[in-house]
């Protein structure tokens, strides 16, 4: 891929018009073969790798020739041969072909991605998951409404192929993609009879399709929104599902209550701020209510005419930040007024003025977290701690470490909220559940466990936040921890919890509109 980038802009026309000959380059299949072996070897033992995994370029070219012919189609998703050895061989070549197809399609996408990175300062785009919370901290307090939308991930194969035709001029190179998409659409495993493009599918092809689909949606959406709203400022944060990010905030970011003065924004010009994490884009708007209604209407029409998708009204919800809360990502987000007393001395006279600023106020969803802990059998539905019976076969150190890991992830992720009193209720549930689990393992009571293990039971576990402040901050900074908001850089560890809670919120909204 680096060789294509070195060619410069003068070869970009050749790269878009003559992609199909790349299918017959042996180096391409060698790269896809090595990538497939790396992925498969990490998921299965080494003794299962035999001589059947040797690559034959002639066989692969024959398979690609069958894909090109419209009257034939290779079986990439369904193995009909009852012979397990033939099944495995067919799956091996199918994965190699899919890897090669993905590599070819990534050529124009990588060129477009590089050009977008070079113009990053102009578009004010951030491409890292660690930037989402500072983005919300800086942009959302100056908005008055939020559009909470969801990207539709069910799309017809032909619509997806037509989006590629806008960037790829070599039509024959899209025939294999069309064959693969239609074959997956007609497979017995796919009950939707449409292409489900989601980032959760652990295949390189569908991950690439998701990134391309989202970038295509956003590139058209940004230009149309900026043109229709006459807005001078359209900042957005887009976070592709990749391992290499274009821009990162590597260190911990601290927002102090005392030093929360921000620049005064102009109230004349409407502003639109766009941020997306995963499948949930959020559009923050500063402007009149008519502008919010226009943006919401435009999003529905945009999906219908550009991608021929009918979106239900509940998929684009509008909220006023001063009255309602938005649930993303794993927080209840709202904006509150923060009064600040300012004293000014001029000509031996003291003037006192009250300055009111808006700041984002993330709320920890205590009740949903307790519901998730009840689902995982740490407590009952009312929040009463119970023993984790499935962990009683582990050692005492493993039990303490597992409970400690859960609490550390929760504390790190939700330390961005000023009001962290609810977290100590979660800590109480986890600590008592840990004690009950140890008591159940040793067939004793909590009192006996505390007496045998002593005070080290709870000092060994649930103390990572104190170690965190003592190692990374001074004593003065640790004393100010209750007045500061801290966004940790290891927040992706808690994503499964935030995503599961977000799914519950989405189901509640869908059930509300289905009634």
Swiss-Prot record:
GO terms for molecular function: RNA binding. It is found in: Plastid, Chloroplast. One of its GO terms (biological process) is tRNA processing. Its main location: plastid. The keyword Plastid applies. Disulfide bonds: none annotated. InterPro entries: Domain_X, Maturase_MatK, Maturase_MatK_N. Keywords: Chloroplast, mRNA processing, Plastid, RNA-binding, tRNA processing. The keyword Membrane does not apply. One of its GO terms (cellular component) is chloroplast. Belongs to the intron maturase 2 family. MatK subfamily. Usually encoded in the trnK tRNA gene intron. Probably assists in splicing its own and other chloroplast group II introns. This is Maturase K. It comes from Pinus pungens. The gene is matK.
């Amino acid at each position: 891929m680096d060789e294509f980038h070195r060619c410069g802009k003068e070869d970009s026309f050749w790269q878009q018009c003559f992609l199909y000959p790349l299918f017959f380059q042996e180096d391409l299949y060698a790269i896809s073969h090595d990538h497939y072996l790396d992925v498969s070897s990490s998921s299965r033992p080494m003794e299962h790798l035999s001589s059947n995994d040797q690559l034959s370029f002639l066989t692969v070219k024959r398979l690609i020739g069958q894909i090109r012919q419209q009257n034939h189609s290779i079986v990439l998703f369904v193995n009909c041969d009852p012979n397990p050895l033939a099944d495995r061989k067919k799956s091996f070549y199918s994965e190699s072909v899919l890897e090669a197809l993905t590599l070819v399609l990534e050529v124009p996408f990588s060129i477009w991605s590089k050009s977008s990175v070079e113009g990053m300062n102009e578009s004010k785009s951030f491409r890292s998951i660690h930037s989402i919370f500072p983005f919300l901290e800086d942009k959302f307090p100056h908005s008055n409404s939020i559009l909470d939308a969801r990207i539709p991930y069910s799309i017809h194969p032909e619509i997806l192929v037509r989006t590629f035709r806008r960037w790829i001029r070599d039509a024959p190179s899209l025939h294999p993609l069309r064959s693969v998409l239609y074959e997956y659409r007609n497979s017995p495993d796919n009950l939707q009879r449409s292409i489900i493009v989601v980032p959760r599918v652990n295949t390189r092809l569908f991950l690439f399709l998701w990134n391309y689909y989202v970038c295509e949606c956003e590139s058209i959406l940004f230009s149309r929104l900026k043109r229709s709203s006459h807005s001078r400022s359209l900042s957005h944060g887009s976070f592709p599902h990749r391992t290499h990010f274009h821009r990162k905030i590597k260190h911990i970011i601290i927002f102090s209550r005392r030093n929360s003065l921000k620049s005064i924004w102009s109230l004349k010009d409407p502003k639109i701020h766009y941020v997306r994490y995963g499948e949930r884009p959020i559009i923050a708007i500063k402007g009149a209510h008519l502008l919010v209604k226009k943006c919401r209407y435009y999003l529905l029409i945009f999906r219908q005419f550009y991608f021929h998708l009918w979106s239900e009204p509940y998929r684009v919800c509008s909220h006023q930040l001063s009255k309602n809360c938005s649930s993303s990502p794993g927080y209840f987000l709202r904006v509150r007024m923060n009064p600040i007393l300012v004293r000014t001395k001029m000509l031996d006279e003291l003037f006192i003025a009250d300055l009111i600023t808006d700041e984002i106020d993330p709320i920890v969803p205590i009740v949903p977290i307790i519901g998730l802990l009840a689902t995982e059998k740490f407590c009952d539905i009312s929040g009463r701690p119970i023993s984790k019976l499935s962990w009683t076969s582990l050692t005492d150190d493993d039990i303490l470490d597992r409970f400690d890991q859960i609490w550390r992830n929760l504390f790190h992720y939700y330390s961005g909220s000023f009001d962290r009193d609810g977290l100590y209720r979660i800590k109480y549930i986890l600590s008592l559940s840990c004690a009950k689990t140890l008591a159940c393992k040793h067939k004793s009571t909590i009192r006996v466990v505390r007496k045998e293990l002593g005070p080290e039971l709870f000092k060994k576990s649930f103390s990572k936040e104190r170690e965190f402040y003592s190692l990374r901050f001074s004593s003065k900074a640790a004393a100010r921890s209750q007045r500061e908001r801290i966004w940790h850089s290891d927040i992706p560890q808690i994503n499964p919890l935030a995503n599961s809670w977000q799914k519950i919120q989405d189901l509640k909204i869908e059930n509300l509109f289905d009634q």
